[in-house]
UniProtKB/Swiss-Prot annotation:
It catalyses: 4-CDP-2-C-methyl-D-erythritol + ATP = 4-CDP-2-C-methyl-D-erythritol 2-phosphate + ADP + H(+). Its EC number is 2.7.1.148. The active site is at 12, 138. Pathway: Isoprenoid biosynthesis; isopentenyl diphosphate biosynthesis via DXP pathway; isopentenyl diphosphate from 1-deoxy-D-xylulose 5-phosphate: step 3/6. It comes from Nitratidesulfovibrio vulgaris (strain DP4) (Desulfovibrio vulgaris). It holds the Pfam family GHMP_kinases_N. It is an enzyme of class 2 (transferase). Belongs to the GHMP kinase family. IspE subfamily. This is 4-diphosphocytidyl-2-C-methyl-D-erythritol kinase. InterPro entries: GHMP_kinase_C_dom, GHMP_kinase_C_sf, GHMP_kinase_N_dom, IspE, Ribosomal_Su5_D2-typ_SF, Ribsml_uS5_D2-typ_fold_subgr. ATP binds at residues 96-106. Coiled coil: none annotated.
Length: 286
């Protein structure tokens, strides 16, 4: 590999996120529905390095070039496979940091998939997903990058049918950052353990499209603790609902909030309202 290879990594929203328990090893069990989005996105420009190992550079402050999801993914793959190619990675961030969109997890998955594609002895998808789960709960999903239900610590991935074609998803990213580690700590401190049986989305089919409503199945265990510290995010969610969204929810541990609109014109009106308030807004026709 002599020429630069540019890896594009997108992001996700959690259309449902239950933190079901905390294990003795510190990992959290989840039950979540992931939807991949192609915008916003990051780029990883990969070139050949001078010696075995990986070097990461990034112009964004707050990202440790020696210890991040990209280096952790490389180290995990190298340990499992013995394959240690010399790589330089320039990380060009487009996904907002601390937004609950899984940008760092997508970066890790991009490197894992890249290493798998160039390794003389690939590890296979199952092993790759196990490695991915050690890096973060979102990483196995990004290995697949299709609508999925994730359980366990994120390593149990089941593709699902997405029934709401024609809906418009509006993603709002305010100038707020929420640390995932802080959010989990706050959740543990609140001792919130919510378990419920869900039948709306399954691997074989879905509930009647007409049964979709604001509160029918969307849930995020992080919302109570994050909204308590960042009430402006609750206000953002409520504003989206007032603009005619069929549903709105914080993604991941925040701070981004997304909404689903049945009518494209309602989404466009909300888009115009929000973009003038120092909020990055993206539209996706599903």
């Amino acid at each position: 590999m002599n020429d630069a290879v540019t890896l594009r990594s997108g992001c996700k929203v959690n259309l449902d996120l239950h933190i079901t328990s905390r294990r003795d090893d510190g990992y959290h069990e989840i039950d979540s529905l992931f939807l991949p989005l192609d915008e916003p996105h990051d780029e990883l420009v990969v070139t050949v390095g001078d010696a075995p190992g990986i070097t990461v550079t990034c112009a964004i402050q707050g990202i440790d070039p020696t210890r991040n999801t990209v280096t952790r993914a490389y180290d995990a793959y190298a340990e499992a496979s013995g394959f240690r190619p010399p790589l330089r990675v320039e990380l060009r961030k487009g996904v907002p940091h601390g937004a609950g969109l899984g940008g760092g997890s997508a970066n890790a998955a991009a490197i894992l998939n890249h290493l798998e594609s160039i390794a003389p002895h690939p590890l296979g998808r199952e092993t790759l997903c196990r490695l991915a789960a050690r890096i973060g709960a979102d990483v196995p999903f990004f290995i697949h990058a299709v609508p999925c239900r994730a359980s366990g610590i994120g390593e149990i991935i089941t593709p699902v049918a997405w029934p709401y074609k024609g809906f418009t998803l509006l993603l709002a990213c305010p100038q707020v950052q929420v640390s995932t580690a802080w959010a989990y700590g706050a959740l543990d401190a609140a001792e919130e353990k919510q378990l419920r049986v869900r039948g709306c989305l399954t691997t074989g089919g879905v509930a009647d499209r007409n049964s979709f409503s604001r509160e029918s199945w969307l849930h995020n265990s992080f919302e109570p603790v994050v909204f308590a510290s960042h009430p402006e995010l609750r206000s953002l969610k409520e504003a989206l609902l007032r603009h005619g969204a069929a549903a709105a929810l914080m993604s991941g541990s925040g701070a981004s909030v997304f909404a689903l609109f049945r009518r494209r014109e309602d989404a466009e009106a909300a888009f115009e309202q929000l973009k003038g308030h120092d909020i990055r807004v993206y539209q996706h026709l599903l």
